């Protein structure tokens, strides 16, 4: 599929403000994750038009895979800074779409973060994947022309001899869930950040320090395997990969069931 066949939708966001930056003057990864989520949801609303309401009465999207790149060079002298999001669907399958969102600095016209997400159409009744309604297929028909994208295999965890471990339990709270009662994608990223920071502060890792967590996160990848709801207790485990000091691995489990696997790259 040529790039000219992709329809791009602009989404108004607002500004970066001081609270969006950490002590090292880098944009917080969680802030960018929230902006990508907002851009994706707003992009769906704009692109679906009058079909948006009827669709979400019977269906919703489950994010199966998410990859984001963050530009670490954005510093505090750029705030206050107007920003907007760009949203596009780059591939349409029978029950999933590949969404691309970008966060753009309006003054410099510079993309500071790109996110690719595989969104699966699921029934609201049982959360099982279903085929898109005909109306939705027609909206994104232009995205069905390309070759099926290669989705990365499920993230693996390091072997015991290749890792250092930090473990932390968390309860899913009221502010962590969406309107359907399921945990927001960005909440998992925050929990991973929290367990990494505690492990780094407790000097569980050889290489990754709290200072690095504040300044050098360049990308993250998340594979969503299961779901949680308010009140669930989830165990988050983080590993520093001793064979690749620039990677942190994460796994979240409810009882013995894997919910997510995630990587932070520095």
For every predicted segment, state its role.
Residues 59, 109, 160-162, 214, ...:
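A generic structural signal for short, solvent-exposed coil/turn residues
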Residues 170-263:
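Acidic/His-leaning functional-site neighborhoods
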Residues 1-82, 196, 200, 204-213, ...:
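Hydrophobic, proline/glycine-rich low-complexity stretches
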Residues 50-58, 62, 87-89, 217, ...:
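A structural signal for short, hydrophobic beta-strand segments that form beta-sheets
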Residues 1-40, 117-118, 122-127, 132-135, ...:
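Catalytic strand-loop segment that frames the active site of acyl-thioester-processing enzymes
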Residues 2-13, 67-82, 86-155, 224-235, ...:
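HotDog/MaoC-like acyl-thioester-processing domains
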